[in-house]
Amino acid sequence: MSRQKSQTSKGHGASKGKEREQRTLIRFKTTLMNTLMDVLRHRPGWVEVKDEGEWDFYWCDVSWLRENFDHTYMDEHVRISHFRNHYELTRKNYMVKNLKRFRKQLEREAGKTEAAKCDFFPKTFEMPCEYHLFVEEFRKNPGITWIMKPVARSQGKGIFLFRRLKDIMDWRKGTAGKKVTSVETQATRANVNPSGSHDTRSSDDQKDDIPVENYVAQRYVENPYLIGGRKFDLRVYVLVMSYIPLRAWLYRDGFARFSNTRFTLNSIDDHYVHLTNVAVQKTSPDYHPKKGCKWTLQRFRQYLASKHGPKAVETLFSDMDNIFIKSLQSVQKVIISDKHCFELYGYDILIDQDLKPWLLEVNASPSLTASSQEDYELKTCLLEDTLHVVDMEARLTGKEKRVGGFDLMWNDGPVSREEGPCDLSGMGNFVTNTHLGCINDRKEQLRQLFRSLQVQKKASS
């Protein structure tokens, strides 16, 4: 149950210390009118509460979190869908700042080889505060392409590419609105529900009417891996249940998002070429709503295996595992790890021609609005399995390595794909418990899991 701190105790206040007691009635609340609402309303034993009613589970948006979290009392069993300062990972400038700091820490403590495992994000500068550092770097490498991104906006809004220092000088003076507006206008025409479907509605959103907001200037990956001549990125889902200790799950399914136009560096102003966001692509004249611009990760993995062989694919996906873990570790000491909180992150990964993955950003509010029937089914399963792992019903033992489509990849240390204790001293033959893009037989796994849990419960009673 949740209530404002100023209110008197009532309802399930006596539940303190009994968070593992099984519950048959879960009161939920959410303001997001999309796939999430369908999943919550169809979950057995879950009932919706509105307005100021007391709740056990709240899938909130980050604006509510910012305004109310510090003033809300929560009993032991209550769960909420964001960590208090999630923006340390999900706001672009903070993410880079934390990754840079973590890399330096690794170099001091473990050497350059270990620190090099953090070299998965393009060279990035925060603007305008690192403007002079950026200019110095820009002049060292004339002619390359850079991309400007507002630190706290989504759906391609405010993004533009450039190669001339004059473009950045115009932006710094607050006169680059023409380029920014062209992208914003196209994305706005997508007519997507702003209450629930936008990615990364950050805790520190900037208002659009200020002349120059904080941006990051990032070296543009000029050699992306292309399929059918088109650029794409990957959306991958990571569920964090705790930061101290770090406990993270990786979902087997996700998707590749394609641009609608063949890739070229000759037209850097054409965002249909360079931005893969669905909100941008669906405004393209060539966009087909039924066809969409997505592949499942399983299809993508099979395609790569046929082109490059299983070994190259294993290396690529292992490198992505490294991105997930290192990025979470980079904020482990700064995220407020409240036991009431969990977070479903949407990672955006770009693959280059050398099959090297690059982290573009991490979303605190990945879109849960479906763009097709296939997308609806994926997100429905994702959300159902998220609720299974969050386990409001207190059915799990806490020792599970797989729940539906989620695989436990980190539990205060790496989790092995093999059963039983593992020797981590050399990590030579260690294989992380991840199956991204592999077969997701979640229904059968859940059936067996809950049957086993029922047997264990009967045996112990």
From Swiss-Prot:
Annotated GO CC locations: ciliary basal body; cytoplasm; microtubule; motile cilium
Keywords: ATP-binding, Cell projection, Cilium, Cytoplasm, Cytoskeleton, Flagellum, Ligase, Magnesium, Metal-binding, Microtubule, Nucleotide-binding
Keyword Isomerase found: no
Catalytic activity: (L-glutamyl)(n)-gamma-L-glutamyl-L-glutamyl-[protein] + L-glutamate + ATP = (L-glutamyl)(n+1)-gamma-L-glutamyl-L-glutamyl-[protein] + ADP + phosphate + H(+)
Enzyme class: ligase
Binding site for ATP: K149, Q155, G156, Q218, R219, Y220, V221, K231, F232, D233, T276, N277
Listed InterPro entries: ATP_grasp_subdomain_1 (IPR013815), TTL/TTLL_fam (IPR004344)
A Pfam family the protein falls into: TTL
Subcellular locations according to the entry: Cytoplasm, Cytoskeleton, Cilium basal body; Cytoplasm, Cytoskeleton; Cytoplasm, Cytoskeleton, Flagellum axoneme
Cofactor(s) it depends on: Mg(2+)
Polar residues composition-biased segments: 1-10, 186-197
Annotated positions binding L-glutamate: R257, K294, K379
SUPFAM superfamilies noted in UniProt: Glutathione synthetase ATP-binding domain-like (SSF56059)
Sequence positions that bind Mg(2+) 2: E361, N363
Biased composition (Basic and acidic residues): 198-208
Domain TTL: 22-402
EC number: 6.3.2.-
Residues marked Essential for specifying alpha-elongation versus initiation step of the polyglutamylase activity (site): Q155
One of the protein's GO biological processes: protein modification process
Binding-site residues for a protein, renumbered to this chain: Q155
Notes concerning its domains: Gln-155 is the main determinant for regioselectivity, which segregates between initiases and elongases in all tubulin--tyrosine ligase family. A glutamine residue at this position is found in elongases TTLL6, TTLL9, TTLL11, TTLL13, TTLL10 and favors glutamate-chain elongation, whereas an arginine residue is found in initiases TTLL2, TTLL4, TTLL5, TTLL3, TTLL8 and favors initiation.
Classification via PANTHER family: TUBULIN POLYGLUTAMYLASE, TUBULIN POLYGLUTAMYLASE TTLL9-RELATED
Purpose: Probable tubulin polyglutamylase that generates side chains of glutamate on the gamma-carboxyl group of specific glutamate residues within the C-terminal tail of target proteins. Similar to TTLL1, may acquire enzymatic activity only in complex with other proteins as it is most likely lacking domains important for autonomous activity. Mediates tubulin polyglutamylation which induces establishment of microtubule heterogeneity in sperm flagella, thereby playing a role in normal motile flagella axoneme structure and sperm flagella beating pattern.
Name of the protein in its database record: Probable tubulin polyglutamylase TTLL9
Protein source organism: Rattus norvegicus (Rat)
Organism taxonomic ancestry: Eukaryota, Metazoa, Chordata, Craniata, Vertebrata
The encoding gene: Ttll9
